[in-house]
């Protein structure tokens, strides 16, 4: 009997598409492109000319896992501060340039690892591309062409009427072509919009038409909650399709929060090694413990742990034991006490007021025992940063 195809695939499709192949760039010591891990960026909120404050915030971002940092350069005093910042920053510094093309050259001379230019608002930018290309090429640094919906070139707006995906892409590729004409191709591109739907379509079109590394971002995303949702939806859609090489979550919040969200997005898609993961139930009428408080206290106690640990915090006996057994460490709470599970086995039962302390102690013990042997026979340090 001949085989009949029912159109059923041999196996499940991959959850994520392969990374889109791009050209490779180096932003300082951080590779950007399909041959490198997806990096997480942020931008300082200090006045750049306040060198000490800016470096202090960069240090905080670095400690939070930031790979690349961008600083604004709106004034001459800011440009004058760039050499000190670029020299002392522990991570690569990108100068963000708007309006004044002269600051592009200042940033290059200052030793910045890259420059972001907004062609929509830099005076006579097209006429200065040859000079910029030569300066960046001589310095061996890349340039990001950062197109924003709110500052599109007038010519593009006259053609399209508004910031459509096609308008964003045309603007970016036009500027890139000018650099290419002068033999410069170390280019990354972003096409940001505050509407995730428009933004996603713009990046899809851009990915189909070029091999430039893409910096993902939703511009003016909003306060922490709203911005987190917008960026997560947009980045998740694109990254699942293999599109995106570096990301910046824009939030009206402490920039450290941008790093936390970006890092979690990548971890959730298995695009970055998972670290601490707290699994907790949403609570309901069956809960016999304050799950919200318990989960928050455990999260706070283990914040910064550099170890892939899954901790389950459950509030009743319905899903609690099952979830706790599937985790590296967990608690199933009820009747004023908690059963502590390690690798699926109950190791002890403790009073409710000792649950948090016990979970933290057990987490540290597991981390020390399971994979923190950096050198055989030598105990490695458990890192929990605050």
UniProtKB/Swiss-Prot annotation:
* Recorded metabolic or biological pathway in which this protein acts: Isoprenoid biosynthesis; isopentenyl diphosphate biosynthesis via DXP pathway; isopentenyl diphosphate from 1-deoxy-D-xylulose 5-phosphate: step 5/6
User: How does the cofactor bind to this protein, according to its record?
Assistant: Binds 1 [4Fe-4S] cluster.
Binding of [4Fe-4S] cluster: at which residues? Answer: 281, 284, 316, 323
Q: Where is the signal peptide?
A: none
> Known catalysed reaction(s)?
(2E)-4-hydroxy-3-methylbut-2-enyl diphosphate + oxidized [flavodoxin] + H2O + 2 H(+) = 2-C-methyl-D-erythritol 2,4-cyclic diphosphate + reduced [flavodoxin]
Keyword Membrane annotated: no
Q: Which InterPro entries match?
A: Dihydropteroate_synth-like_sf, IspG_bac, IspG_bac-typ, NO2/SO3_Rdtase_4Fe4S_sf
User: Would you kindly state one Gene Ontology biological process term found in this protein's UniProt entry?
Assistant: isopentenyl diphosphate biosynthetic process, methylerythritol 4-phosphate pathway
Required co-factors: [4Fe-4S] cluster
Q: Name one GO molecular function term.
A: 4 iron, 4 sulfur cluster binding
**Which EC numbers does the record give?**
1.17.7.3
Q: Which domain of life is it from?
A: Bacteria
Which keywords belong to this entry? 4Fe-4S, Iron, Iron-sulfur, Isoprene biosynthesis, Metal-binding, Oxidoreductase
Q: Which NCBIfam families match?
A: ispG_gcpE (TIGR00612), PRK00366.1 (NF001540)
Which family is this sequence assigned to? Belongs to the IspG family.
- Please give the function described in this protein's UniProt entry: Converts 2C-methyl-D-erythritol 2,4-cyclodiphosphate (ME-2,4cPP) into 1-hydroxy-2-methyl-2-(E)-butenyl 4-diphosphate.
Please state what the protein is called.
4-hydroxy-3-methylbut-2-en-1-yl diphosphate synthase (flavodoxin)
